[in-house]
Amino acid sequence: MEQAIIAGGCFWCTEAVFRDVIGVSEVESGYIGGSVADPTYKQVCTGSTGHAEGIRVTYDPDVISISEIYDVFLGTHDPTQLNRQGNDIGTQYRSAIFPLNAAQGEEAKAAIERWNKDNGKVAVTTIEGLTGDAQTAPWYPAEDYHQEYWDGEGQRNPYCLAVIPPKIMKLRKSFQKYVKS
């Protein structure tokens, strides 16, 4: 099993999408890319910590590649929006990839270039924290109530009901071969 860390707006949304992707065994919501150790959701929401709301995906590379993970990521949120996704505004909602090694860094660059070419637009997705062959930004798991949010509280949350189903539909329409049956 391997891992990937990505940030594409509210982690509830990104987590919900990747829970439906083949080869993915675990999705953990959390914070990465900031300057405060062990940040809380309340702190991150102020935008002052520098963290992004992200997800750490554990996946089987024999089922889905890192390249395909990045393609699904870029294709299920709007990577052209700087420091926001829809009504969620702030650096904590930026579109970013946090490669865990140099190979993932190269795949991230290639995925962004592919997305730009295929869509005729320019993604503002950043590649962050990679120094040499290591990710230097610490990962901090989000509070327990954020984990598997869509599967529980999210089904009753008006924000989630408005934002998550269109992302899941985009996954099912544009990335059908990567959807769990």
Can you say where each PLM-predicted feature lies in the sequence?
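Flexible coil/turn and secondary-structure edge motifs
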Residues: 1-181
